[in-house]
C-alpha cells in the first residue's frame, strides 16, 4: 500500500546527515519526509559527545552559514567551548564544543518538529522503488507501507549491514543499545550495480563519575571569552559550563592491552573493514607507536544530568573484562566503573566515485547519498554532506540544476571533490591540510563566503538575511573609517600608541596601516581616543582585523583561485568516450572513461592524469568547438 501523499524529497536516516538533509529540503519549501528507525534518537551522538575541531569546526561554520542547524544546536547544548590552534594563524583556528548529548538531541528534535514542509515518521526502509534508472520511492516492510518520492537521500550511517564487536562476541547492529541493522538495503543497492565495501569504526568505554578521582587529573576549562559556534548564536544560549579532564595511559595499561591482543577482533581477523587512520583504537596506538610510554585521554562529560563520562582516546573492541582491567590501570580511574563498554562496528559503504559532485548517484537518477555511506567518519562530515544532498534533492524535485561548492569556496567543496574524484579506502575525515586554499576558507568568513549563495538557494530566512547584511555593512563601514582616520606623531594619544609599537611613530598613519603591524590588534587600537568609538561586535572587529592583517596573502591566493576557477569551469562532455581524443595514453583513456570527470579541473586531480594529457584535452575541446565555460 502506498502512503496517500507524494513527497518531493524522502530522507532515509535521522542522524547528523539525515537531519541536515531533511531541514535543507524543507527550508527550500519542498514537501519532505524524514524516515528514521527511532524518533527518540534523532541527532544522537553515537561516539564522543563533541562538535568541531580542526577542519571539522570549519565544516560546522559552513553548515551554519548556509542555514543548517548543527552550530545553533551545539550553542544550546555545549558545556565546554574552546578555540583550538588559537595561537596560530587564522586559517587553522578551529572551534570545538563539548556537548550535553541529551540537550543536543533535544535541540535537533525541536528544530525538526517545528520545521514547515517536513514530516518525520518512525520506520525502517529496507528496499527502494526504482523505475528504469530512476528512483520513485522507498519500502518499509515492517510498516507495510510504500512511500513515493521524486528524490531520495540515503543517510544510513553505520546501520547498513552493521556488525558490532566486543572481544570475540559480535552481533548485528548499527549502534550499541539500538535496533538491529539490516542487510536488505545493501543487497538491493548491490543488485543495482553499486560498488560496496566495508569500513570499521569504534567507540570508547563510558564510565561513572562516582568512581573517578578528579583531584588527580588536570582540568581543562572553556576559553575566556567563551566562543560561540553559530553566526546567529550567543553565549546566552549556552548551558552551564563544566571542565573536561586529562589523564594518560601508562606502561601497565599498555601491557594489559598487548597481552590481550589475541582477544581483539581487529588482530584476530574477525574484523575485515578498514579502520580510521586518524582515530586509532588503543590497540592500534600501542602496536603502531610501541615506543610511546603514554597516550593522552580526555575525560569528556556526556551531559549535565547524566553521570556518564566518555574516555576519548581509548577506543577499543577488547573484551569487557579486559576493558575493566585497562581502565583501572589509569591514574584517576583506579576505582572507575564502566557503564557502557567500548566496541568496534563494521558497516557497508559505497564507492563515492559513483556520485556526481551534487551527491546524486550516476547510476540511479534522483538517488542521493550522504554521510558514512560515502566512506566518511565524523558528525561534521556527515552533516555537511547531508546539507548538500538535501539542497540537490530539493533542486532535483523542482527540475533545477544541481549546485555544489568549488574547492576554493568551502571545505564542503574540498570534501565532496576528494570523495567523488579519488574515492576512499579508509574512513575519510576533514583536516585543514586537505584544503589548498585554506587561507581563504577560514571559520570566521564562512558566512561571507556562503550565506549569499544560500540565500539564492532558498535556505536563508528574512531575519537571518538582515542580520548578515547588517554585519557585512558594519565591516565595510568600520574599514572605511579606519582607512580615513589618521594619527600623527604630535597627536595627544601618540605616547599611548608608542607603548604598543616596537618603534615610535614617525609619520602620519591610518588605522588600517597600524592594524597591519603584528604588535597591534583592534582592541589596542580602540583604546586610543583617535580611533574611538570602536565596534563592540566581536564577529565584526575580528573579521576586520583578519582581513587587514592577511590582505596581501589573501590577494595572492585569489590570483591562484582565478586560475583554478578557469579549469573548474572548462567543462567536459558528459557522454564523451575518451578513446576519440588523440594523443592520450591507454592508461589515461581508461582512467578518464572510468572516472568521467565533469571538468578539466577535476580531470587534472585524478591520479596519473599528466599535464600533457590535460593539454591534449584542451586542444581537442578547442578543435571540436567545445571549449565552453560554466559561468555559475
Curated annotation (Swiss-Prot):
GO terms for biological process: tRNA methylation; tRNA wobble uridine modification. Keywords: Cytoplasm, FAD, Flavoprotein, NAD, tRNA processing. It is found in: Cytoplasm. FAD binds at residues 13-18, 125, 182, 372. Gene3D superfamilies: FAD/NAD(P)-binding domain, GidA associated domain, C-terminal subdomain, tRNA uridine 5-carboxymethylaminomethyl modification enzyme MnmG/GidA. One of its GO terms (cellular component) is cytosol. GO terms for molecular function: flavin adenine dinucleotide binding. NAD(+) binds at residues 275-289. It comes from the Bacteria. Its main location: cytoplasm. Its cofactor is FAD. Belongs to the MnmG family. Homodimer. Heterotetramer of two MnmE and two MnmG subunits. NCBIfam families: mnmG_gidA (TIGR00136). NAD-binding protein involved in the addition of a carboxymethylaminomethyl (cmnm) group at the wobble position (U34) of certain tRNAs, forming tRNA-cmnm(5)s(2)U34. This is tRNA uridine 5-carboxymethylaminomethyl modification enzyme MnmG. It comes from Blochmanniella pennsylvanica (strain BPEN). The gene is mnmG.
